Design a protein with these regions (language model features):
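Active-site lining segments that contact anionic ligands and/or coordinate catalytic metals
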Residues: 75, 116-118, 129-135, 158-164, ...
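Outer-membrane beta-barrel transmembrane domain signature
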Residues: 4-5, 137-147, 154-189
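C-terminal outer-membrane beta-barrel translocator/porin domains of Gram-negative envelope proteins
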Residues: 4, 14-19, 23-150
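Residue-level detector of the transmembrane beta-barrel scaffold of outer-membrane proteins
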Residues: 17, 34-36, 75-79, 135, ...
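Solvent-exposed loop/turn segments connecting transmembrane beta-strands
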Residues: 8-9, 42-50, 124-131, 183-186, ...
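Composition- and surface-driven signal marking solvent-exposed, interaction-prone regions
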Residues: 50-53, 71-75, 148-155, 177-181, ...
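A short, hydrophobic secondary-structure junction motif
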Residues: 15, 40-46, 81-90, 160-177, ...
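Outer-membrane beta-barrel "beta-signal"
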Residues: 193-197, 212-223
Length: 223
């Protein structure tokens, strides 16, 4: 679905998250796994939106490839993310008698494009009832670190930086169907430069797709 459609992004509800983290370091994991199940629900109690339910699941896995003569750290990182809004096609009439769909807002729904998933596309480029996205990253941390020797920048305390290559494959669909979600999937490919600045990972991602290219700047790894 084209994200240019008008959606209500104001909501009042609750979110339940079950997070199991078996990695060595949450800030920059090198091995282990992490799973996260999230259920968000809005009962429409404040009449700010119609009721809706959104379910998301994510599995991330990391493999430490060890050091080399020039690499301080090499990591293969994989991520699977999927989302569904089971109330998507149900409707009800609000106080004004207008029929409203029970659909989650963009920031809680099944969206691709932007800072975390399908980074070669604009934010919320694809939006529908269901979505799936696969990501693979190769994270290379060189032993060479020029930042402590650069005036002014050396005050930022940058102990390491990374060069990252990534590939993403995913799509949205009007129902959660394994076959539908794996047809004509969208692809993002690109690279990233990341650095630890005051205990926070800062990243600049550059990605290309069939629709062009995007530059995404944010903090923390995408997963």
């Amino acid at each position: 679905m084209d994200s240019g459609a008008l959606y209500q992004n104001k909501t009042s509800g609750v979110k339940f998250t079950l997070d199991y983290n078996n990695t060595d370091w949450y800030n920059n994991p090198t091995h282990g796994t992490r799973q996260r199940l999230t259920v968000a629900r809005d009962w429409g109690l404040l009449d700010e939106s119609s009721t809706w339910t959104a379910i998301q699941f994510r599995h991330s896995q990391f493999f430490n490839l060890g050091e080399t003569e020039k690499a301080r750290q090499r990591v293969l990182a994989f991520d699977i993310w999927t989302s569904d809004v089971p109330t998507w096609n149900s409707t009800s009439r609000n106080g004004d008698g207008v029929e409203a769909f029970h659909r989650a807002p963009l920031f809680e729904g099944s969206t691709l494009g932007g800072l975390e998933r399908q980074r070669a596309f604009p934010s919320n480029r694809f939006h529908d009832r269901s979505a799936i996205n696969y990501t693979a990253e190769y994270r290379y941390m060189p032993k060479w670190n020029p930042f402590p020797n650069i005036p002014l920048i050396n005050t930022l305390h940058i102990p390491w930086w990374q060069w990252v290559g990534y590939l993403e494959v995913g799509r949205v669909a009007d129902n959660w169907s394994f076959s539908d979600l794996h047809k004509k999937m969208k692809v993002s490919a690109g690279g990233s430069v990341r650095a630890m600045v005051y205990e926070l990972v800062i990243r600049v991602d550059v990605g290309v797709s069939e629709e062009g290219s995007e530059v995404q700047m944010f903090f923390n790894h995408p997963f």
